[in-house]
């Protein structure tokens, strides 16, 4: 999560958002996710990344390079769930719908869940956990949501042999608007959603009614709560913006946390029985002996699962606080790590930490892509991990063995009293970085000689010793910054070409550590994500984008890129600027090659195409996966800052994206779900 500004006259303000077993049970063969007992049907999209492993690849090929120019809008749905206002009240539609059970399922920033007809976009049912305002028909949020801005998706489970009762229940509930006061009797197909209030909801996928057996042991009707269990640390619970994951008969749900509080609540990951809601296991990235000294390490991003090997893959974040770790100078090997858990017990099978003693907010930002790649002439079951640093790590899925070497590289030390930076960081070898990682004085950018000179003067005043330069009292340049490099949803695999398509941002931030005058400094409210009191530490942090007086980034463009990495050779096959800056009706010409800061990510299809929105210019693009050539684009009402998806009904392929803008980026805001298809 981050806020920055990028603008002035032609480039106005911009901000980018980037989030011990207690019991066990054997996997029930009768109750598994649809993809656990068979491959995902070609026309379905059953998890955030299409399949449980999160490949972000569709095997559909009806739309291809020859006909993509003919794509047209098939339908548009508007939920009404948006607030066109600045942060913190403005919304950001980041959802990726599922297509399964003959419906499209998605969530909104106001916590509602919709089921749509995939051919027409008409509503089948709506679940609203809030009471509804009588005048507007919209959720009446009282009290207002703590973070009413993001919901990236929902999860799906079904019994292996659902009964014929579905047809009757679905027919009776067509067009129904469910609330958390209803109850569904059957629930042999379930939609799971993380709520804003520590809850995990279970809904009947046919009707939208809550599954009354889920959470019944705790006295709930259709939901469970993390608050019902032991939680270490201080402060409020964080919200969860990403969907749960389903593996066998458990649903795995995580929480975010307050990383500006030294002993924040720990970011627990819990697995619940899909039917009863009973706790199966829980996982805490913080070692037990340190649970009351540090907190916040969590999994705010998406989770992937390996059905074949019964593994859950977690991308964990930094512990609290961001930017200063003087109070947590002890070993925590499961933070800033890819962690593979046994799906039945929740015990760690293997882990690999990729950031040591994080002082940079280098959270792991996206689910590991669990895909079969070609490397060294053989097919390998891989777990691919993109990072904010612009590094791509690859591991053998069942053992954690690196697929390309990782070496410990010496990095700059901290000069902040009380701090001690890690002496080395693990750097992969043999795989090209997908983002810019170095910055020199001569590279600094400016629209005019005057603002370029201003960037150079600022550069001379600040500390910059290359990558992993820690924050300092003097002020340090962090590049890549916590904006990325990579970020959530940012990578998609194409099995036909063995290419990983991955987007990046190339922006730097300035971070200054300031000693607190007294305890009252802890009570100063945060200005934004980069300027905060760091409660419980002797310092506060002030941060901003590294930019000129004109509000233009000092880092050289392109500020947003899309790259194809050849996983066999480790080299970039192609790289292009992604999108254009657009603000106040002005779009920077494509030929400038500046690219655009971006939120969201790509998908690939068997038609040889990469589809991506994500950019400030409100365009939805189709790129030739093998060459990087743009083949088609369509203008969206507002930016599509989400991961798109593709599905098929009756032999017809659709490509869909959520276009809702992003309040943290300062774009226009909306509530559009737009499907495209070839004309009949």
Feature annotation, model-predicted:
Residues 1-4:
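N-terminal secretory signal peptides that target proteins for export/translocation
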Residues 7-20:
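Bacterial N-terminal signal peptides
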Residues 25-62, 171, 423-452, 527:
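N-terminal pre-domain segments of enzymes
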Residues 45, 52-53, 75, 79-81, ...:
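Acidic, proline/glycine-rich low-complexity intrinsically disordered segments
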Residues 45-49, 90-112, 143-199, 236-269, ...:
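Repeat-blade elements of multi-bladed beta-propeller folds
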Residues 46, 52-59, 82-87, 114, ...:
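Short, solvent-exposed loop/turn elements at domain surfaces
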Residues 66-82, 113-146, 156-173, 200-235, ...:
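Extracytoplasmic/lumenal domain signature
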Residues 429-509, 517-518, 561-564:
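Long, low-complexity segments enriched in small/aliphatic residues
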């Amino acid at each position: 999560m981050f806020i920055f500004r990028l603008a002035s006259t032609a480039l106005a303000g911009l901000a980018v958002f980037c989030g011990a077993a207690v019991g066990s049970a054997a996997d029930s063969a009768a109750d598994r996710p649809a993809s656990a007992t068979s491959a995902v049907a070609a026309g379905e999209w059953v998890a955030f990344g299409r399949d449980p492993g999160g490949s972000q690849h569709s095997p559909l090929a009806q739309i291809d390079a020859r006909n993509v120019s003919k794509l047209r809008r098939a339908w548009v749905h508007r939920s009404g769930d948006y607030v066109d206002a600045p942060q913190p009240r403005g919304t950001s539609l980041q959802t990726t719908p599922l297509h399964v059970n003959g419906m499209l399922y998605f969530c909104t920033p106001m916590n509602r869940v919709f089921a749509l007809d995939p051919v027409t976009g008409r509503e089948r049912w709506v679940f609203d956990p809030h009471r509804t305002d009588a005048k507007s028909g919209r959720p009446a949020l009282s009290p207002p949501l703590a973070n009413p801005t993001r919901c990236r998706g929902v999860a799906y489970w079904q019994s292996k042999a659902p009964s014929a009762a579905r047809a009757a229940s679905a027919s009776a509930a067509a067009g129904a608007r469910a609330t958390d006061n209803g109850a569904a009797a059957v629930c042999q197909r379930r939609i799971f959603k993380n709520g804003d209030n520590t809850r995990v909801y279970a809904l009947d996928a046919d009707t939208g009614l809550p599954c009354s057996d889920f959470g019944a042991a705790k006295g709930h009707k259709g939901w469970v709560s993390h608050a019902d269990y032991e939680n270490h640390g201080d402060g409020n619970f964080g919200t969860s913006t990403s969907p749960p994951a389903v593996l066998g008969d458990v649903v795995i749900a995580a929480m975010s946390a307050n990383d500006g509080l030294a002993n924040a609540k720990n970011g627990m990951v819990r697995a619940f029985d899909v039917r009863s809601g009973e706790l199966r296991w829980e996982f805490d990235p913080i070692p037990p002996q340190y649970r009351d000294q540090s907190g916040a390490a969590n999994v705010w991003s998406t989770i992937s699962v390996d059905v074949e090997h019964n593994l859950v893959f977690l991308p964990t974040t930094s512990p609290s606080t961001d930017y200063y770790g003087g109070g947590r100078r002890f070993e925590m090997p499961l933070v800033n790590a890819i962690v593979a858990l046994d799906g039945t017990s929740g015990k760690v099978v293997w882990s690999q930490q990729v950031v040591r003693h994080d002082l940079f907010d280098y959270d792991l930002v996206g689910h590991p892509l669990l895909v079969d790649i070609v490397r060294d002439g053989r097919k390998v079951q891989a777990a691919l991990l993109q990072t904010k640093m612009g590094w791509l790590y690859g591991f053998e899925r069942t053992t954690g063995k690196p697929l390309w070497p990782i070496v410990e590289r010496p990095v700059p030390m901290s000069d902040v009293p009380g701090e001690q930076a890690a002496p080395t960081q693990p750097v992969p070898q043999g795989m090209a970085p997908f983002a810019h990682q170095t910055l020199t004085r001569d590279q600094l950018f400016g629209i005019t000689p005057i603002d370029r000179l201003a960037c150079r003067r600022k550069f001379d005043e600040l500390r910059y010793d290359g990558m992993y330069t820690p924050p300092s009292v003097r002020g340090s340049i962090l590049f890549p910054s916590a904006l990325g490099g990579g970020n959530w949803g940012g990578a998609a695999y194409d099995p036909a070409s063995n290419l990983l398509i991955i987007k990046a941002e190339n922006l730097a931030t300035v971070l200054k550590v300031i000693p607190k005058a007294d305890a009252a400094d802890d009570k100063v409210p945060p200005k934004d994500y980069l300027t905060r009191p760091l409660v419980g530490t002797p310092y506060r942090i002030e941060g901003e984008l590294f930019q000129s007086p004109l509000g233009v980034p000092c880092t050289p463009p392109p500020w947003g890129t899309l790259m194809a990495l050849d996983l066999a050779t480790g080299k970039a096959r192609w790289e292009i600027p992604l999108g254009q800056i657009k603000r106040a009706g002005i779009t920077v010409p494509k030929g400038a090659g500046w690219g655009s800061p971006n939120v969201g990510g790509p998908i690939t299809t068997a038609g040889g195409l990469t589809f991506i929105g994500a950019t400030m210019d409100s365009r939805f693009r189709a790129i030739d996966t093998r060459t990087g050539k743009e083949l088609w684009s369509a203008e969206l009402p507002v930016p599509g800052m989400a991961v798109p998806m593709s599905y098929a009904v009756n032999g017809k392929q659709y490509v869909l994206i959520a276009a809702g803008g992003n309040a943290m980026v300062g774009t226009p805001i909306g509530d559009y779900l737009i499907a495209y298809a070839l004309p009949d």
